[in-house]
A protein has these predicted regions:
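Register-specific beta-strand positions within repetitive beta-rich fiber domains
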Residues: 1-32
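A conserved acidic, glycine/proline-rich C-terminal tail/linker
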Residues: 113-114
Length: 146
């Protein structure tokens, strides 16, 4: 997120970063640990292809149905455009929950390399997807868990 779109506020001894336009919390730096503010996107279909904005919301729940399915990540160009100011070597992450009754395979779109191709997320299992920016419009997705 571009710095001009962020407002920082000291409140009750913690530093909060908010969206400058809506004042929606983005991240809080407190005395104990970092606090993230996440948005849940729910997909009810065999195959899911959430948008870059939905991935950046932080949590994808997927009700996989009627046979093995896929979770297709957004293209590198779309992800790069959605995360303004992300430098090479920086990461973004998303928590993924397969709450359906089918196994799901994480699949790549253009500009994305899945580090552990073929890794699946079994029924009622979860994974953390970490996207490492390696060049403009180019990411490696690390699939941790499940």
């Amino acid at each position: 997120m571009a710095m001009s779109l962020v407002k920082s506020i000291w409140e009750s001894g913690v530093l909060r970063f908010r969206n400058k336009g809506t004042l929606t919390p983005i991240i809080t730096l407190g005395t104990l640990r970092l606090h993230e503010y996440l948005v849940v996107t729910d997909v009810d279909s065999r195959n899911a292809a959430p948008t870059a904005a939905q991935f950046l919301g932080g949590i994808i729940t997927h009700n996989s149905q009627t046979g093995a399915g896929t979770l297709t990540v957004p293209t590198g160009a779309l992800l790069d455009a959605a995360v303004q100011g992300l430098a090479i070597g920086e990461t973004v992450k998303c928590y993924y929950l397969n709450r359906g009754d089918q196994t799901v395979t994480v699949t790549a779109a253009a500009g994305i390399t899945i580090a552990d191709t073929g890794q699946t997320v079994a029924t009622t299992e979860a994974a953390i997807l970490i996207f490492l920016k390696t060049a403009a419009d180019t990411f490696v997705c690390y699939h941790i868990g499940a």
